[in-house]
Amino acid sequence: MSIKIDVSVGEIMDKLTILDIKADKIDDTEKLANILKERESLLPAIAPPAYQTDEIQQLAAKLKQVNLRLWEIEDAIRLKEAEKCFDEEFIELARSVYFTNDQRASLKKQINLKTGSELVEEKSYEDYK
């Protein structure tokens, strides 16, 4: 069973970039089969030409890089957690999660606005900069 819901263009592109990263990083054949199946089910959603412009593809590439950075940060944090090492590096890694997620949200919003997405995700956080 699967559920069909409306989501923003940026959300679909975000999900696809994460699935691409998982496909590159995960070797387990059962997990990989699930990842590829999910990816294939989402690809038709970004098939329209409006989502395939150079500008949108560049934003999607940036989004993938940000998501890859998040993957690396999370891996590093989990190693520190496993070692019970809550030093300055751990704190910087933890802080970098929300800095990097802010970049991610910005890119998703740019994609949504540039594609005319009917749905646009909004964030509401205190300004910390």
Label the model's feature ranges.
Residues 1-129:
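Extended, charge-rich alpha-helical interface modules
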